[in-house]
Every structure is written in structure tokens, then in C-alpha cells.
Amino acid sequence: PQECNEKGIPEPEFAAKILAEFSQPNTCVMGYNNIRYDDEMTRYTFYRNFIDPYEYSWKNGNSRWDLLDLVRACYALRPEGINWAYDDDGMPSFRLEKLTKANGIEHENAHDAMADVYATIAMAKLIKEKQPKLFQFFFEHRGKKEIEKLIDTAEMTPLVHVSGMLGNYRGNCAWVAPLAWHPTNQNAVIVCDLSGDIDNLLSKSAVDLRQDLYTKKSELEERGVSS
């Protein structure tokens, strides 16, 4: 507290300075896991100080992008040219400090704000150099409108989905079929993971599927139902 009082500035002033930087027209805010963490902290800070928490990321041609998802996609789809890091169980690790070390990128004081900034920039440059087409594709499709053009729920055209929710053991990657747009959230689409057993999805009624959805996994396994 003493150091903050001596060197810091009031939070409303701090939030205004961040807003000014993030609101420069036609810029993209990028980080490493920023969409799930840093951006949420930014939004909370803006909201707490009576600033629109979303406007900075879309107004005046602005956007946001998360390098972590690009790194995961690079590992799963175009791994050549990057030295990948693994944990003790042999699973791929996407921790920034491990990847920078594996690729000879200086990253002292990991999790120090500025050190992480320079490390993130270096990893982005590395992927752009080694896999330029992948980098460009993901950059051009960082926005919702571009992604919507790829989604065909009428034909349920399969898509490659990359997400940390899928797990490192499967490269955070899976084929999915878009089934329908979410009824209440226009930014979400309901998909089917095609890497699993979809027989139940094809043969059961909506009522039975709903019951299975809220049944314990152990009970489903006892009945021989795959989840």
C-alpha cells in the first residue's frame, strides 16, 4: 500500500490511461490467455470505473486476439518449425515460459508483466515466420463475423475446433459438427464432437437425450451409455 501511495495513480485515472491505449483505431489487443483472464480483468476494471467494458475491443475497427489458441492450433495442425515443450507425463505443455525456453527465447522473470509481453511478441513472430499461412488465417478469422461465415448449421458441415477444453491429451483439437445456433446467446453455436460415439445422438429422442445430459456419468456407464 505504501508503494502504491507513493508511486501509483488513482484507479479511475489508471483505467482511463488503459482505455486510451486500447482504443486507438484499427488496433488489435493480443495476449497469452488474455481472452479468458486478462480481458476479463480489464472489463471488471472498466465497469468498476463507469467505462463501457466492451466497446474498446470492437469500436473503430478494433479487435482482440489470443495467442494461446494460435499456439495450440499450431501444435495440432502445423507443428513443424517450433520446438514443443512437454510435461512429466509426456503431454504437450503450452506454458509460455516452457515454450520460450524450448525455442531459445529470452524470458527471465516469467509472469513479470513486461517479460511476458516480450515473450508473447517473440512467440507470435516465431509462428508467423515458421507457419505464415496458419498465422494469417487465424489472424483474419479472429472476429465473430469472419467465423460466422465458416459455420453452416443447415448442412452441419464439420469444422476443426481448437480449444483448451478438449484437453492436451488430444492436442486440444477435434472435428465438430455445428448443429444449431444457441437459442439465447447469439455468439454461441451448439456442436457435436465427432471424435466420440454419436450413435445415441442419432437414435435417441430429444427427451431421452435431455435426461442423459443431466445424469451422472457413472450411472450412464452402468447402463452402457457413452458420454
PLM-predicted stretches and their roles:
Residues 140-220:
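Acidic catalytic cores of enzymes that act on phosphate-bearing nucleotides/polynucleotides
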Residues 224-227:
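Short, intrinsically disordered, charge-balanced linker/junction segments flanking boundaries
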Residues 8-9, 21-22, 42-44, 168-171:
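A short linear-motif detector with a strong N-terminal bias
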Residues 10-12, 25, 53, 79, ...:
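Proline-rich intrinsically disordered, low-complexity coils
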Residues 6-17:
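Glycine-rich, highly charged phosphate/nucleotide-binding loops
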Residues 1-2, 22-132, 138-141:
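Metal-dependent phosphoesterase core characteristic of DEDDh/y 3'-5' exonuclease domains
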